[in-house]
Amino acid sequence: MEHAEMIERLMEKTTLGEEEARSALEQNGWNLLDALIAEERAGRLKGKSNSYRTDEAAPAGKAAEEHEADGRQDVVWFSTDGIERIEIDWVNGNADVALWDDDRIMLTEEGKRPLAKAEKMCCTVRNGTLKVVYSESGGFFHKARLLTEKRLTLRLPRTMHPGAITLTGVSADWTVKDVRTDKLRLKTVSGNCTLERVDAECLEIAATSGWTALRACSEDGSTAIKTVSGSVRCFDCRIGRQISVHSVSGDVAIELPADAPGFALRFETVSGDVQSSVPTTGTRSQMVCGDGSLAIQVNTVSGGLTVAKL
């Protein structure tokens, strides 16, 4: 883009005159995106932006003054009234979901540097769904959204039991602990997934290259995991009904508690190996241990499978 066009674009989006726009671009190395972010921080963008938008309920609280001052951290609270589902779309940075003793929902985001409004998360409540997106959509800030790494923390009341929780990320690492829900869906590209003591009737995880680790999850439910090259580890596997894992080249390890009554395993692979330290009957592709109450289905191309007990 020529300098003249960049000046014109900056003038369209800000309250700057021609010489001011030229000076702003020169100070930012003629990088239009950086200039826009700088002018947004200075409050010279045209129009207004609200990082927290709600249709049915407004945040019950805001970030503490010291957090608002440096611009790196924002905190927002929601009442649980009317919220039946939670959806989070987080592009880059760690995301942590857990319970706490307060009776409100709390969301915290923290950047490695001060965040412009267009880089901050947006929270909306509509038709019973609390939706959190990484940043405002569209325009010149698309590239910045992908490059800005931010940490998200979600705290839910211990008494809350959402009907569904959907978590989506690109390179975000997810940690989910002690959450209760009817259905939890987690999808990521290169991020890692750690779930501990998650109580869900239906647990679905899809990952491309990041590893997935589950510990003591879904005691009364079923779990489905799909991955391409990421490894899958199920520690202290207390899944009640069934677990299915589909992997291309990632290895799969399932560790059952010592008091597990048994399992029925079906393993389909092209070249992957299977190792079991648990006494079983049957063949390499169909094994039975104990009463066979837990159904395990594992499909891989070259990924191996290990089954053990604590």
Residue ranges of each PLM-predicted region?
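Generic detector of contiguous secondary-structure segments
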Residues: 112-125, 190, 251-265
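Short beta-strand "wing" residues that participate in macromolecule-binding interfaces
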Residues: 47, 97, 254
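Short, surface-exposed interaction patches in beta-rich subdomains
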Residues: 203, 213-310
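Structural motif
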Residues: 91, 126-127, 170, 189, ...
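Right-handed parallel beta-helix
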Residues: 73-85, 94-96, 118-202, 211-220, ...
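Active-site alpha-helical segments that house and flank conserved acidic catalytic motifs
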Residues: 86-89, 167, 186, 205, ...
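Short, amphipathic alpha-helical interaction segments embedded in low-complexity terminal/linker regions
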Residues: 1-78, 82-83, 104-108, 113-117
